Amino acid sequence: MAEIQHLAICTKNNRRLARFYQLIFGLEESWNRFQNSPYAFYMSDGYINLNCLQIRPGSSYNRMVDGQEIMPDAGINHIGFTVKSVKDIEQRLSSLNPPVKLVASPQDGRYEEWRITDPDGTIFEIAEGGWEAGGPERLPAIRYVGIRSEDPERLASFYKSALPIREVNRVTDPTGEARAIFLSAGKTALGLLKKTSASKNGFERVGFQVGSIDEIKKRLHNAPPYLYPGEPEVSVMTAPSADPGKTLYLKDPDGNIVELSEEGWIA
């Protein structure tokens, strides 16, 4: 089984974003003693390693287009899977049509070893060594990541072929077309959600299993400051009935969707 153990959110203020997740969800800093970088701010729930990654010129996640460096937008940028055998993943990728090649990650002390691009152009990473996540495991904990796609079926087929993961649930419309396909990736579910007119392809949301949603509401109200003057208040909201996700969610200070659930996700 390939396990999601890493999530990176690109941001223009990594300290502020890390502060929010520490104050509201109790994530703790996870120190990477091998990577001397002010741009990667690693947080942990005891199982998942969350990188609040500073957007900057020269990042390996930037793209060159017509000679211009394009930096990523603020938002969820990529996930990382811990795998038992990179060689097995390489064989899986080579058997795809067309074949997909592993791309080596920069060797500067970061945890990931290889990068892969899915059919929608979304990056994910793999590593045999995994990501440092501290411990012990606890709640609140990241237990879900959601990706929007024009074709969830195609994307599900790719991930199930490229990685040792399996489908555990799906939501369909009256015609039988998939609105959401959920894959098991260790203790964390990967959701492939049908793109809507109001959304765009790529990573869209993260989900926290929490002991008490009321406690999260109290923390949002009583926590020390994590917003700047004039920024909108963060509050727990109810999702539209057509949304295939959980009923309750919030948006972090950067606008990322964070689903909330006491029962968790099937994984």
How does the language model describe each region?
Residues M1-A18, I76-I79, G129-A156, V168, ...:
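N-terminal beta-strand motif that seeds the catalytic metal site of vicinal oxygen chelate
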